[in-house]
């Protein structure tokens, strides 16, 4: 643990639509703390509704940071988020207050606690080169390249794992070191593991599935179509993370009149449920036993489970 790691932070993890944001606001009010986005999709601008960013009413109830601050034309790494959080925690007006980290991106939580190796930044030129080759040649061809240049990591990757193959080649070219070597470098913690309150929301699966369906229908009614229309007007690379947000492909198909409204909503709901299942599985398998599991945000406050860190 770093000596500068923030003590008494609150960490709230859980699948999408599980009630994390409402719990974070309630905790911010109880502690006088501030909320920090810990979700890799909610960093992008334009998609307020489809990424379920806090509403204007939510923003009025508590201070929120690192939401929608990244243009959808950009990529944004865990390392960049780590840097932004570090800068945020150093602000004079926030020091001494309780940071409440809330979101569904497991790697962000791991990075906060020092459990993620600090990966090097890769230049846009190198990234574009290898991603262009991946698109042109395919995963098997680039896996063969990796077998020659870095046989150790190539042996650990499936020949079809295009994302990790490209990442390994990018890092090797940028730094001259294998990704395996970078992964051995211990991460630096921004949050003190021992004093942090670590919470995982794990709601009933049927309840969550219904909530996801209701929420996406509300997104549609409140302007998700306009969001996607604005995103498409930017004429972005389909490979960018923002273009892969759940609902973008389905709403785009609706706008192109290749999919009905009902089918677009149904497919988006199914994709969101599948994503929530993957998130829940990750949290169950990857977070330590010191993370306390609750079925709902309300349960956190029942029976004196929540302690004010101030």
UniProtKB/Swiss-Prot annotation:
Recorded catalytic activity of this chain's protein: adenosine(37) in tRNA + dimethylallyl diphosphate = N(6)-dimethylallyladenosine(37) in tRNA + diphosphate
tRNA processing as UniProt keyword: yes
Location of region: Interaction with substrate tRNA: 39-42, 163-167
Positions of substrate binding: 16-21
Molecular function as annotated in GO: ATP binding; tRNA dimethylallyltransferase activity
UniProt site (Interaction with substrate tRNA): 105, 127
Binding-site residues for ATP, renumbered to this chain: 14-21
SUPFAM superfamilies, A to Z: P-loop containing nucleoside triphosphate hydrolases
InterPro entries membership: Dimethylallyltransferase (IPR039657), IPT (IPR018022), P-loop_NTPase (IPR027417)
GO biological process terms on file: tRNA modification
Gene3D superfamilies assigned to the protein according to its UniProt record, in alphabetical order: 1.10.20.140, P-loop containing nucleotide triphosphate hydrolases
Record EC number: 2.5.1.75
Keywords: ATP-binding, Magnesium, Nucleotide-binding, Transferase, tRNA processing
Cofactor(s) listed: Mg(2+)
Chain's role: Catalyzes the transfer of a dimethylallyl group onto the adenine at position 37 in tRNAs that read codons beginning with uridine, leading to the formation of N6-(dimethylallyl)adenosine (i(6)A).
NCBIfam families linked: miaA
HAMAP family xrefs: IPP_trans (MF_00185)
Family the entry assigns: Belongs to the IPP transferase family.
Binding partners and assembly: Monomer.
Descriptive protein name: tRNA dimethylallyltransferase
Organism: Brucella suis biovar 1 (strain 1330)
Higher taxonomy: Bacteria, Pseudomonadati, Pseudomonadota, Alphaproteobacteria, Hyphomicrobiales
């Amino acid at each position: 643990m770093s000596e500068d790691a923030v003590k008494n932070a609150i960490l709230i993890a859980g699948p999408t639509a599980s009630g994390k944001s409402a719990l974070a606001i309630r905790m911010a009010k109880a502690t006088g703390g501030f909320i920090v986005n810990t979700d890799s999709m909610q960093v992008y601008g334009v998609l307020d509704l489809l990424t379920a960013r806090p509403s204007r009413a939510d923003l009025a109830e508590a201070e929120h940071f690192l939401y929608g601050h990244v243009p959808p034309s950009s990529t944004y790494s865990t390392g960049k988020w780590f840097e932004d959080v570090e800068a945020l925690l150093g602000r004079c007006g926030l020091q001494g207050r309780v940071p409440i980290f809330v979101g569904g991106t497991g790697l962000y939580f791991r990075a906060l606690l020092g459990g993620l190796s600090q990966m090097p930044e890769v230049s846009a030129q190198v990234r574009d080169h290898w991603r262009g080759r991946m698109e042109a040649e395919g995963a098997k061809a680039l896996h063969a390249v990796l077998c020659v240049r870095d046989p150790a990591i190539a042996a650990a990757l499936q020949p079809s794992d295009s994302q990790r193959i490209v990442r390994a080649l990018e890092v090797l070219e940028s730094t001259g070191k294998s990704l395996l070597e970078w992964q051995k470098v211990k991460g630096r913690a921004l949050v003190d593991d021992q004093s942090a309150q670590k919470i995982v929301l794990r709601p009933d699966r049927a309840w969550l599935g219904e909530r996801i369906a209701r929420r996406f229908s509300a997104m549609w009614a409140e302007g998700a179509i306009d969001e996607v229309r604005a995103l498409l007007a930017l004429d972005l690379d389909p490979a960018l993370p923002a273009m892969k947000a759940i609902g973008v492909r389905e709403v785009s198909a609706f706008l192109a009149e290749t999919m009905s409204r009902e089918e677009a909503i149904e497919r988006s709901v199914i994709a969101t449920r599948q994503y929530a299942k993957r998130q829940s599985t990750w949290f169950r398998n990857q977070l330590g036993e010191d993370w306390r599991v609750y079925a709902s945000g309300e349960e956190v406050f029942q029976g004196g489970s929540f302690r004010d860190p101030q």
